[in-house]
């Protein structure tokens, strides 16, 4: 089964690459000079946003006949996601790909898209991030920072892996897991009953193995790629957050580029964006059987639990939105309506 799933995913990526190649355009580069773009990434080499950013860079270099190249790094070699975002804002770096939640210190309204359970499913995620809500947020980012958002890469829903079976909300009470040191995460998991502690991602595996904590939460592909199935044998698909990354460029740098370069970069990403979303969804859907092959039991919340979750968070959404700044209270009503 594992080999079949791998072959399916490889075939999907090959089909996507073929489709992208067929759609190539020609550009007038006769008056253009060579350009090197600095593009550091915070995530590791297996992360979906890293994989597709690398494909995007290759496409840009090819379409520019080698005139556009990249000074590229990943795995937070040049700093954390927040540091890289601030570096793009200050003009220290030209581009990056950053989780949306990192922007809230500069644009508090971004948290309206990062609220727990505000994204219902993949169809809803596409409607939100390809539609009015994300357009509003990216407009605010451009107004308040020297940053232009070129697009979004969906990363998937976050779930909890644990050493003990968790099958319902009641099982989560006082269960100790690692969460990022962010208020929204602590609020979300705490509201489900979890006891939350923060530590670096690099320490989490050994902490679970040693029994210091009982589990952690992130996307399924990250859990699998880092081998958490060896130290924790249960997953509860809580789907408490939908993770996404914004593809950003320093606005001053962007506006000084030749129009043909902007077209190459933007056109290429438009094609990569669609492929990345399809791959992220397909990958997430393939994860459950892969975990089961590793001896992991996967649970889902019941319909009754989902009703309780909506009761827990519907008031929370509105209370939080009021504190996020102008327009957030109206946007939360739009997001709630889009879940219907």
Write out the residue ranges for each language-model feature:
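Generic cytosolic/nucleocytoplasmic N-terminal low-complexity/intrinsically disordered segments
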Residues: 1-2, 319
């Amino acid at each position: 089964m594992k080999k079949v799933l791998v072959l399916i995913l490889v075939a999907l990526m090959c089909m996507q690459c073929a489709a992208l190649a067929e759609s190539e355009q020609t550009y007038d580069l006769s008056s253009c000079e060579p350009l090197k773009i600095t593009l550091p990434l915070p995530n590791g080499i297996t992360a979906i946003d890293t994989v597709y950013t690398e494909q995007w860079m290759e496409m840009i270099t090819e379409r520019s006949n080698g005139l556009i190249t990249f000074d590229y790094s990943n795995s937070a070699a040049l700093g954390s996601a927040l540091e890289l975002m601030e570096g793009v804002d200050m003009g220290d770096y030209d581009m990056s790909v950053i989780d949306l939640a990192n922007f809230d210190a500069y644009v508090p309204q971004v948290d309206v898209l990062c609220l727990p359970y505000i994204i219902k499913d993949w169809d809803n995620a596409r409607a939100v991030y390809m539609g009015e809500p994300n357009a509003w947020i990216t407009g605010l980012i451009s107004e308040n920072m020297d940053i232009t958002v070129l697009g979004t890469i969906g990363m998937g829903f976050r779930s909890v892996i644990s050493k003990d079976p968790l099958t319902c909300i009641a099982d989560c009470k006082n269960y100790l897991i690692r969460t990022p040191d962010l208020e929204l995460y602590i609020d979300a998991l705490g509201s489900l009953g979890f006891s939350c502690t923060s530590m670096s991602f690099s320490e989490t595996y050994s902490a679970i193995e040693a029994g210091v904590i009982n589990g952690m939460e992130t996307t399924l592909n990250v859990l699998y790629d880092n081998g958490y199935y060896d130290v924790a044998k249960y997953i509860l698909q809580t789907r408490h957050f939908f993770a996404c990354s914004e593809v950003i460029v320093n606005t001053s740098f962007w506006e000084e580029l030749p129009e043909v370069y902007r077209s190459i970069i933007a056109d290429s990403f438009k094609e990569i964006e669609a492929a990345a979303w399809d791959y992220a969804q397909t990958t997430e859907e393939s994860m459950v059987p892969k975990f089961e092959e590793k001896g992991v039991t996967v649970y889902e919340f019941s319909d009754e639990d989902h009703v309780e979750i909506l009761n827990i968070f519907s008031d929370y959404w509105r209370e939080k939105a009021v504190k996020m700044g102008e327009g957030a209270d109206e946007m939360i009503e739009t997001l709630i309506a889009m879940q219907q």
